[in-house]
Amino acid sequence: MKSERPKVLHEICGRPALWYVLKAARAARPTTLAVVVHGAGDQVAEAVRPWGLEPSPTFVEQRELLGTANAVAVAEYAVGRVDDVLVMAGDDPLVTGEHVRELLSVHRRTKAAATILTASLEDPTGYARVVREGHRLVDLVGEDAAEADPEIRSIREVSTLVYAFRRDDLYRALPLVGRDDRSGEHYLFHVLRILKEKAERLSAARIDLGGGMGVNSRSSMARVSRIMRERIIGAHMAGGVTFVDPATAYVDVDVRIGPDTTILPASSLEGSTRIGSGCTIGPATRIRDSVIEDEAEVTFSVLRESRIGPRATIGPYASLRPGTVILEGGKAGTFVEIKASRVGKGSKVPHLSYVGDATIGDEVNVGAGTVTVNYDGFAKHPTVIGDQAHIGSDTMLVAPVKVGKKAWTGAGSVITKDVPAGALAVERGEQRNVPGYDERKRAARAGKDRKQAAGKRSRKRAPRGGRDSG
């Protein structure tokens, strides 16, 4: 991955890869949950704890990278005395709880010593091929042997790194797993061969992973993310949400969207965003950790940690920063930036304005070019605007300042003092009209042009100095 971050903590659709794996593992209703880590164990543990998993995971350190069999071996005491052990790779987020339940169902129904989860890939290069008869696993053929046998090479079904074992069979076989000749590691799938030699029953459960497997590189992470997005968006569409172009929509796993909402192209819904029913989002809109209530519209805009009320209108090209609240029927229009502010019911900030640290009442109109001047170079200060106030275009509201209910400000005013309710505040130089200005201006310009032209003609007639002849 070429990263300082552990591979299992790289995010897929808003959550680390490991989050999906542990979520799937919980479908088995485990009595114990062990996470084997190497190197950045503290970093992984710190990331996992806030997820509030039950049972709480036990973190086991694999001091040397000696392979998957060794990783399972070092977790023996953390696993405890149980009947079955489920083993999953921490970098395979496409495996779901449904897949885990299918694996365990086959494992218990066939009374197998070990059962593997399998999937079909268009390109199975690098994976062990599965040879089976029904649910019975006949053989698991490694990459080198598969390349040597055309019949095996044609098999597309491969082993995932998800296994179910009878505990006692697993931990009796692990000490017998030798080192791989090429890598020097101990591989878990060698346990299957040992169990097969002991005439134990082996089973296989096939699932559909959508053509993806684990995350081993940036390119595989992009492929897995695409498959995950397709799953997420498919679930939303099944719930009554319209995606005009699903291929250009980016929706994180924790996002919730109500029915009859339309998501237009090139929109990104991230984090814990909640969108109500009957909304229109996009195109080219990014919303993170925000709440959009019913029938709101957000167009060509960026929202972070904001709340938008019913039937409110945002954009185009609005930027709503953390702490912004737009109440029912409110508007933040074209090229408007709002931060840590509350805009009341039916109030409008239509265009080209900055509103920061402000409380705006109901049915207020904020004219174009208005700025709440909230920063004095050291601290931020609040602006309060009462209900039904009218803020003239290009008004500078120098905070801290209050504009009363039904008060007005004149266009172009710099308001530095509180404005009483119902009053008009105007702060600008008095307009002076100069009669006949255009005629005098043009006459003066014409005279200047004539004088310049005469000067040019005079210079052309003047004799040029030169060498005497003769």
Feature-to-residue mapping (PLM):
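Conserved core of the sugar-phosphate nucleotidyltransferase
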Residues: 42, 95-182
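Conserved beta-strand segments of alpha/beta enzyme cores
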Residues: 8, 56-58, 136, 201-203, ...
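Conserved alpha/beta core of the MobA/IspD/sugar-nucleotide pyrophosphorylase nucleotidyltransferase superfamily
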Residues: 156-258
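N-terminal nucleotide-binding beta1-loop-alpha1 segment
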Residues: 1-4
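Conserved N-terminal catalytic core of the sugar/cofactor nucleotidyltransferase
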Residues: 11, 15-109, 446-447, 468
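Residues that recognize and position ribonucleotide moieties
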Residues: 10, 93, 163, 214, ...
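Long, low-complexity, intrinsically disordered segments
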Residues: 456-470
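Structural signal for interior beta-strand "rungs" in well-ordered beta-sheet cores
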Residues: 242-427, 431-432
